[in-house]
Amino acid sequence: MTAGVEAAFRPRADALAAQDWAVVEAQLHEHFVYTNSHGERLMREGYLDFLRDGPLRWRHQSIEDMLVVEAGDTAVITGIVFDHVVIDGEERELHFATTQTYARVDGTWRYLAGQTSAMDLG
């Protein structure tokens, strides 16, 4: 387990809840790409546009069953993300399997790629 890359998750999650888009943007790698649970691929600017202007507003985000695998300046986090959000005025709790890839750039972990998949928790 790598405390450095694990610690990179929390500030982004907190920034989502605070709608602090500058913090989110600063954590994204310049070549960031994200595939959502609907299979839609968003590059860095499209992802930021979705966060700023999309229908979701985060109240809180957490991750459970986190596993971190590091290889040099690359690290992969897998786990289950729990999103407490507001969608069109309605409070919702969503959960997804997630894979997040980070690259260490000048000593700082940057979020390079992510994918979420819908899952049934029973």
Indicate where each model-derived feature is located.
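A beta-strand edge to alpha-helix "cap/lid" segment located at domain peripheries
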Residues: M1-E25, V33-G122
